[in-house]
Amino acid sequence: MNYQPTPEDRFTFGLWTVGWQGRDPFGDATRRALDPVESVRRLAELGAHGVTFHDDDLIPFGSSDSEREEHVKRFRQALDDTGMKVPMATTNLFTHPVFKDGGFTANDRDVRRYALRKTIRNIDLAVELGAETYVAWGGREGAESGGAKDVRDALDRMKEAFDLLGEYVTSQGYDIRFAIEPKPNEPRGDILLPTVGHALAFIERLERPELYGVNPEVGHEQMAGLNFPHGIAQALWAGKLFHIDLNGQNGIKYDQDLRFGAGDLRAAFWLVDLLESAGYSGPRHFDFKPPRTEDFDGVWASAAGCMRNYLILKERAAAFRADPEVQEALRASRLDELARPTAADGLQALLDDRSAFEEFDVDAAAARGMAFERLDQLAMDHLLGARG
């Protein structure tokens, strides 16, 4: 297989990813700032489909209207020159100190109103640039201590904010949807809507739930010790996987943002298998940080590695599914039975069926092996390149 990406693969990158300068809580930047235009051109050369941005990635915070127009003009020209797309945009409501207690759920009402206006302004730009999805990551929406935040009131304010944003895009006739990005902690000690499940439950309370989905990130769910492919499966099941952030993470620790495939490789395999078999048609968006040890050659090598690893795993997953032994092993593990309704004949038929309880042989059923180990080893063989 050719592992050279093309725009048809729909790989996208945030400007903040390749543009990360390597600054962390313990050390200063190790790389200069990247011009967004340079990022667009270099990613296009690597075979990417598009780029995404926070408002402050593209337009420095505090820019005048004329400066803003010039930044947007240069960026738009780079998009036109390269054919790169902007499928998604988002708002930075976490860097400036004004957001130290959050944006939509800050205790200070004036900060909340400012956060909404900042978001609305960037939604206008996102739509102008062709974005179909608007991501909301509430990195500062949370607390470090129990008395600092009444979570019920905070969720009311969160709901109010999203309802207002939904009202705005509807009134403007914008064809754009929102994707909530969960994260359990960091930078706040505890963040509201910490997992995919929390976000899905929250969405059902909104006035226009059809406008809202989720943008799960590999590392964020794995920071909480959760199974990322399972979370994605539930989002797909709910019809709410509006966007996805791909990266690498090694277990429960800080948010590593490794290149995709460089963390939990087995989870990455099952994730790609799921996305491809489910027919997910959205962008494969990489939200990672090239390590601060790297110069710009390393930055572009890391970005290329994200795409290459996805394509390799896509090939391995396809070979796994096409393998006759795997298909037989799936039947031996009774995956086909799981797909059958338990009581398609209805409740009364279930109650009348003596074989379902009175005559059910629990000992025989308990003695049946599931053959999961053989199935899993076949998956490992394909992942490691020993088959197909």
Curated annotation (Swiss-Prot):
Q: Where does this polypeptide localize?
A: Cytoplasm
Record EC number: 5.3.1.5
Could you say which residues bind Mg(2+) 2 here? 217, 220, 255, 257
Which reaction is recorded as catalysed by this protein?
Answer: alpha-D-xylose = alpha-D-xylulofuranose
Q: Which Pfam families match?
A: AP_endonuc_2 (PF01261)
Could you state a single Gene Ontology molecular function term? xylose isomerase activity
Per the entry, the cofactor note is: Binds 2 magnesium ions per subunit.
A GO cellular-component term linked to this record: cytoplasm
Q: Known InterPro entries for this protein? A: Xyl_isomerase-like_sf, Xyl_isomerase-like_TIM-brl, XylA_actinobac, Xylose_isomerase
> Tell me, which GO biological process terms does this entry list?
D-xylose metabolic process
* Top-level EC class: isomerase
- Record-annotated residues binding Mg(2+) 1? 181, 217, 245, 287
Cofactor(s) listed = Mg(2+)
The family assignment reads: Belongs to the xylose isomerase family.
User: Any idea what job this protein has?
Assistant: Involved in D-xylose catabolism.
From the Swiss-Prot or TrEMBL record, give the protein name: Xylose isomerase
Organism of derivation: Streptomyces rubiginosus
Lineage runs:
Bacteria, Bacillati, Actinomycetota, Actinomycetes, Kitasatosporales
